[in-house]
Regions:
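Active-site-proximal beta-strand/loop segments in catalytic clefts of secreted hydrolases
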Residues: 83, 154, 216-219, 256-262, ...
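Structural motif
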Residues: 88, 194, 205, 289, ...
Length: 431
């Protein structure tokens, strides 16, 4: 029979093992249920360009601009990013607010009680130097996913052009004299435009842990020919699909950096059209690397280099490789998109831009994109959109009518054709 001393030692060992096991179980359970820390991530963005005509050229004076943006992911707080990148003089924002829209009440109206001020270093106003940018303080506001948010800016002083802007917003902006940043009604904002001014991003704070995905593209990404005020760009459909289908709701933000007419090789200014923006390489730093939480870039440029610049396949491929190299150096995942069909596209009424010779360049580029090991993945928009009976043409039901830009249904088909596993981060890849 064991001595009392031996029994005490045995009991102490049993207790130690039991407590240790309990701690191990508790630690394991704690790891399993520990919430992802909140991080800032881009939910919406717009690529900005130098001024063109109208308001972008003339500027503003003692006026309010109310703009609407469509989120991809939601969050518990928000902040806005503003830019005076192409301005030649300081830009003063006298008052900025965020709110939920209330379109059933009237054009430009806001949901009562939803308007919140956006401060800058604790101040109501901010002055942004020429070529500069600003980020607001965090705004305590629940931001829903895949929903519109109203951003209202009041410009108190004479603000001459050129105004940094985005030409084809596909969203109505409302403009009026005086400070109406906190007004829930749009009644005094009677002037309308289809542009975004100075506003380049909306960030949210959330726990997705998936960061953001930037799409560097042209007019197809920009949503040209989609329904105005309906948010039917392929990136909008993709954002909504990810929110719905991503495991545990952990969707990345989708940031649209599309510019109509944009090219890999040349700027819009080379055509005398500033609002087409800088070429893809020149704007890569601002429009991709400058985004909040960016982890992946989708390259969706090249078709304008085929028909507008009439560049060679070798040059187009070299430019895509250059962009991929820039992304890799920044630690980003790189996905490319094949160039979609464009047979019968007219560059002007009665002027058919398409030729089989030019299309052979597109096909050569696509062959490279499908087979190259230079990228982390390929989205085959050519295969998704082409007419099986005539592969050089868009499917009729997805053609907006100009034979190069997909309609709303075509944009939805593009989003559905994307394998989501290309876009979602594995747990072991997260920071």
């Amino acid at each position: 029979m064991n001595s009392p001393r031996q029994r005490q030692i045995v009991m102490a060992l049993v207790t130690l093992v039991t407590v240790g096991s309990t701690l191990l179980v508790a630690t394991a359970n704690s790891q399993a249920v520990a919430p992802e820390p909140e991080r800032w991530v881009g939910s919406w963005s717009a690529a900005l360009t130098p001024a063109g005509a109208g308001k972008s050229k003339d500027g503003f004076s003692d006026q309010t601009i109310r703009m609407f943006v469509h989120t991809s992911v939601g969050g518990s707080q928000a902040r806005i990013r503003l830019s005076n990148r192409y301005g030649t003089k300081p830009l003063t924002i006298g008052h900025a607010t965020l709110a939920l829209p209330w379109p059933e009440a009237g054009p430009g109206d806001l949901k009562p009680g939803s308007v919140v001020d956006a401060a800058f270093n604790g101040q109501k106003s901010v002055t942004i130097p020429a070529g500069g940018s600003a980020v607001s303080d965090p705004v305590a506001m629940h931001v829903p996913a895949s929903q519109d948010i109203a951003v209202t800016l009041y410009l108190p002083a004479q603000t001459p052009g050129p105004a940094t802007w985005h030409l084809y917003a596909r969203e109505t902006a409302y403009i009026g004299a005086g400070d109406h940043a906190t007004s829930a009604t749009g009644a005094k904002l009677a002037e309308t435009r289809n542009n975004w001014y100075y506003l380049t991003g909306l960030d949210v704070l959330n726990r997705s842990g998936q960061g953001s995905i930037v799409v560097l593209g042209d007019s197809i990404t920009d949503g040209l020919k989609t329904t105005v005020n309906a948010d039917r760009r392929w990136t909008d459909y993709l954002g909504a699909r990810l929110v719905k289908e991503a495991p545990e709701g952990r969707a990345p933000g989708i940031l649209n950096a599309g510019l109509s007419g944009n090219r890999l090789t040349l700027d819009g200014a080379d055509l005398g059209v500033n609002e087409l923006g800088m070429n893809g390489s020149s704007r890569f730093h601002f429009d991709v690397l400058g985004q909040t939480g960016v982890r992946t870039v989708i390259l969706a440029l090249g078709i304008n280099d085929v028909w507008l610049s009439q560049d060679s396949a070798d040059n187009i491929i070299a430019r895509i490789q250059q962009l991929a190299s820039l992304a890799r150096q920044a630690g980003l995942k790189v996905i490319v998109c094949t160039l979609s069909p464009w047979n019968a596209f007219e560059s002007a009424p009665g002027v058919v831009a398409y030729t089989p010779t030019l299309d052979s360049v597109r096909l050569t580029v696509n062959s490279y994109l499908r087979t190259s090991t230079d990228f982390d993945g390929v989205i085959d928009f050519d295969a998704a959109l082409r007419d099986p009976a005539n592969p050089t043409k868009l499917r009729a039901e997805w053609d907006s009518g100009d034979h190069i830009h997909p309609n709303d249904a075509g944009n939805e088909a593009m989003a559905k054709a994307i394998p989501l596993d290309l876009l979602l981060e594995d747990d072991e890849d997260e920071d």
